[in-house]
């Protein structure tokens, strides 16, 4: 990494990294030079002053689109039990308000199968299990602000994926795998013992046990125990979740790549691995997009996980503030905002 001149930074890679632009927005890659007396920034605003209670920003006169930046100054403050109307924008609002919007996060909530466990190793069995679950019912009753989804990837990353409904008769699929009322499938479901996870798990178990072919042993454990069991592969079906570090499908698709340290489900598929590695090497954007679609569809077709919903962030935006648009990463940039003046 080196500066060619005052305005050009050159980054040379040892291999193709198609998601580098998205990765550069991650906090771990921010500039190391951070002298508090003269912080460096190339954004729409510069730090004017900061302390433990507030951060004051001033418009950057060198910003390339400075003429499109409305506010001369922006102040960031901690939100501590005060009226929302005292602010223009409040992120992660703890209360209900008419000016509340929910911005999608790159975070999914799902249950994970241990694909090395013979009871759930067959795709047809997992498909039968998934067909018994109503994600809408669970979400509407437990976390209505979330986005119900039976897809593993966040909604914004599903470009081109077929969303047609596929009729599935769970009992037929289970019977084909020698599972019946006399010889039911015994499932062990692990989840954390905090109230939200308990409530979701109870609804999930209630839906699964509507079939006489399933017997479910549900166990609530501490978060630490849940993580330890996931790490060891000591589970059959386990409550899970994932938040992407950067806005790119590979941040989710890597969970099923056999060589990934984040693969805790035991999935190992030569075709999936080959496609995944091909996407990493390809310099053709269209080809990469087609591969992402194939990988995502493979996850869905084999029911490699049991997705329930995508998280959202509640954001209060004053009715006088314009320019805030919902986006796939749930980010609001001050440079995009402007105030509507009442006549």
Q: Where are the predicted features?
A:
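Gly/Pro-rich hinge or "lid" segments in bacterial periplasmic/extracellular proteins
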Residues: 6-8, 12-81
């Amino acid at each position: 990494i080196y500066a060619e001149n005052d305005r050009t930074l050159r980054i040379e890679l040892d291999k193709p990294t198609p998601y580098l632009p998205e990765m550069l927005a991650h906090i771990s890659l921010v500039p190391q030079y951070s002298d508090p007396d003269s912080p460096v920034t190339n954004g729409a605003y510069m730090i004017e002053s900061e302390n433990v209670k507030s951060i004051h920003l001033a418009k950057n006169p060198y910003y390339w689109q400075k003429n499109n930046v409305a506010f001369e100054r922006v102040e960031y403050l901690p939100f501590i039990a005060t009226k929302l109307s005292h602010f223009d924008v409040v992120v992660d609002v703890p209360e209900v308000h008419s000016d509340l919007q929910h911005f999608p996060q790159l975070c999914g909530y799902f249950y994970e199968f241990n694909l090395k466990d013979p009871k759930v190793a067959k795709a047809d069995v997992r498909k039968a299990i998934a067909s018994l679950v109503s994600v809408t019912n669970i979400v509407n009753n437990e976390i209505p602000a979330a986005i119900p989804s039976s897809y593993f990837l966040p909604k914004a990353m599903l470009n081109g994926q077929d969303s047609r409904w596929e009729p599935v008769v769970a009992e037929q699929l289970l019977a084909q795998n020698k599972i019946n009322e006399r010889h039911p499938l015994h499932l062990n479901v692990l989840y954390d013992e905090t109230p939200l996870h308990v409530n979701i798990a109870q609804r999930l178990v209630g839906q699964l046990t509507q079939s006489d072919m399933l017997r479910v042993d549900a166990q609530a454990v501490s978060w630490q125990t849940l993580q330890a069991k996931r790490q060891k592969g000591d589970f059959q079906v386990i409550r899970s979740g994932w938040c992407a570090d950067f806005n790119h499908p590979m941040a989710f698709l890597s969970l099923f790549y056999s060589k990934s340290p984040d693969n805790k489900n035991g999935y190992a598929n030569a075709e999936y691995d080959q496609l995944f590695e091909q996407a990493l090497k390809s310099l053709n954007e269209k080809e990469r997009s087609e591969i992402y679609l194939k990988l995502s569809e493979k996850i869905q077709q084999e029911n490699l996980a049991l997705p329930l919903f995508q998280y959202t962030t509640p954001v209060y935006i004053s009715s006088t503030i314009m320019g805030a648009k919902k986006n796939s990463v749930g980010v609001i940039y001050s440079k995009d905002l402007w105030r509507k003046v009442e006549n």
